[in-house]
């Protein structure tokens, strides 16, 4: 039996599908999931036929040096505004670097339909301007993400290795908290062993919201964005079959999305210009070697 996603989430998805050529809205959220790394392939980027325009698919294992590869891809294809994710994870630090790049580019992220954003892939997903995923076992539109704690690759039986594992978890916690990921979910992630997985529920996804709090406040300040209220109004209009009210709300949503999309395109152009000059986003904390996921 399929798990339910929120009714507001259904409304957002339906509205997005209606207007996907002119707006860029995603809903739901995720954290780490564990999969068999032996089956992973090197990270690849390609255009995604599902959206036909302005979308790229990132898939495979995340390895050291991939941030530069991703940056070169976006320099070559600056019109990409959607990043579809289907990755089994990989190097945590590299994933965070790519995530910071995604944040600077102000592009949207989505877990691929019948795919997954596993393990360290979460750091890429969470930095999307708008982000979409679904709860486990829900089939339709996007894929799920789960969570577990990050861990060292090939740890040694030494006090130094144990201290390094602790430092990895502390740095990850600080990073997630600085991005206002709910502490409840951070606690779940850090207490979940790396050989187990917690799949986010619809309630977890609802709690995370489709946009980071900082970016949501920018949209409110610049575009008077009242997304949540409008989506509730749209849902109510659909339930009442009030076509006049539905049309009114959809017009407001389109205007709002046009405004927020304009802000995102402006930020994207500025980031591309910096990338061309050789800039890459700095790592948000001191690098820790020998970590992975």
Where are these regions (language model features)?
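Bacterial N-terminal signal peptides that target proteins for export
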Residues: 2-26
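Bacterial N-terminal signal peptides
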Residues: 25-34
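Sec/Tat signal peptide C-region and signal peptidase I cleavage site
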Residues: 34-40
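N-terminal organellar transit peptides
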Residues: 40-115, 130-141, 151-293
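Short, solvent-exposed linear patches
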Residues: 116-120
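Amphipathic, non-transmembrane alpha-helical segments in extracytoplasmic/periplasmic proteins
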Residues: 122-130
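Histidine-centered active-site/metal-ligand motif
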Residues: 146-148
């Amino acid at each position: 039996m399929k798990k339910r996603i929120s009714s507001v989430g259904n409304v957002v998805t339906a509205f997005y599908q209606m207007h996907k050529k002119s707006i860029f809205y995603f809903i739901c959220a995720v954290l780490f999931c564990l999969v068999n790394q032996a089956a992973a392939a090197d990270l690849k980027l390609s255009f995604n036929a599902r959206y036909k325009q302005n979308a790229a698919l990132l898939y495979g294992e995340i390895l050291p040096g991939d941030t530069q590869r991703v940056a070169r891809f976006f320099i070559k294809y600056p019109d990409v505004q959607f990043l579809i994710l289907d990755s089994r994870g990989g190097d945590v630090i590299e994933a965070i670097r790519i995530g910071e790049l995604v944040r600077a580019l102000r592009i949207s992220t989505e877990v691929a339909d019948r795919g997954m954003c596993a393990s360290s892939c979460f750091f890429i997903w969470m930095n999307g301007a708008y982000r979409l995923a679904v709860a486990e076992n829900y089939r339709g539109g996007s894929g799920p993400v789960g969570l577990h704690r990050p861990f060292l690759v090939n740890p040694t039986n030494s006090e130094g290795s144990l201290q390094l594992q602790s430092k990895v978890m502390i740095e990850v916690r600080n990073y997630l908290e600085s991005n206002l990921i709910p502490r409840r979910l951070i606690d779940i992630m850090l207490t979940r062993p790396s050989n187990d997985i917690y799949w986010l529920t619809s309630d977890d996804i609802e709690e995370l919201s489709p946009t980071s709090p900082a970016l949501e406040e920018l949209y409110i300040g610049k575009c008077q964005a009242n997304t949540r209220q409008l989506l509730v109004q749209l849902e109510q209009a659909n339930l009442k079959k009030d076509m006049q009210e539905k049309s009114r709300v959809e017009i407001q949503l389109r205007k709002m999305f046009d405004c927020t999309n304009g802000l995102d395109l402006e930020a994207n152009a500025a980031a591309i210009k910096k990338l061309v000059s050789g800039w890459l986003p700095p790592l948000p904390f001191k690098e820790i070697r020998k970590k992975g996921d």
